Amino acid sequence: MDASFLETLHGIAGAAGQALLEMYGAASLPVDYKGPGDPVTAADRRSNRLIVEGLNQAFPGIPVVAEESEPASFKGFHEAERVFFVDPLDGTQEFIRRNGEFAVMIGLVEGRRAVAGVVDAPVTGVTWVGAVGLGAWRIDPEAGRRAPVRVSAIDAVARASIVASRSHRSARLERALASLGAREVRPLGSAGLKGAQVAEGVAEAYVDTGASTKRWDACAIDALVTAAGGRVSDVTGASIDYRGPTLANERGLVVSNGLTHEAILAKLARHVPPQPR
């Protein structure tokens, strides 16, 4: 893993982001549904195709598990040492609403842990990249800046800013967020954008107690936040297992600056989802 690897991922994510922007301004955007509350558009599929093709060309032999690919293409990824997890349009509902809160995410797993991640925000042009052991950066082409990022030093939940889903707000999540007693809880679309806010110290944590997110929602921000000095786990404190039997984050997702993590887990203990059978 080196800087050139991250630059290649950055380029692939950026190209997909530009393709999304071309469709973002379309007068109409037909929407299909994979399930209740789970929309998909031609933009999702176009970005998915561009990323998968780009990764296959740049890194042949590394399997790609991408949200809009056919599940049959995932076959064998459990046995591979390295695997890419891709969300080609993270925040489809926000894309449809045109509020700007969506991202492109590419993450790399080695063994069982996320080691590299890229989160690209097409509307602002900002990209966050990180690799465990190398560090994390915020790249802002418009400002001509590439700056290292680090999680915040706030160590009390009462002084913390928490970000949570804008579009997926269950009663259980609302109760869990209220139980934290944080300084503020802010709604924000896109798991990637929420994770990026934690990585650069704008927020102290991102909390999701449900099972709606998948491994491709977690992988890039897992690597990014870890590289920036934070911590990522499920609501029980266990690391995300990218080689597990399911692609769903069935026990939720907690992304933090690390200093507030244990306190958040303790407060969430009453809201832990039932153990999957």
Predicted regions and their residues:
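Short glycine/proline-enriched turns and hinge-like loops at secondary-structure junctions
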Residues: 76-78, 96-100, 130, 245-246
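Acidic beta-strand-loop-alpha-helix segment within the catalytic core
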Residues: 106-196, 202, 250-277
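N-terminal subdomain of lithium-sensitive/metallo-dependent phosphomonoesterases centered on the IMPase/IPPase/PAP
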Residues: 1-89, 175-179, 238, 259-277
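Oxyanion/phosphate-interacting regions
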Residues: 1-11, 175-180, 195-277
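Glycine-rich active-site/cofactor-binding loop and its immediate structural neighborhood
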Residues: 80-122
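Residue-level signal for inorganic ion chemistry
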Residues: 20, 44, 55, 92, ...
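Conserved beta-strand termini and adjacent loop/short-helix elements that scaffold enzyme active sites
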Residues: 34, 67, 165, 188-190, ...
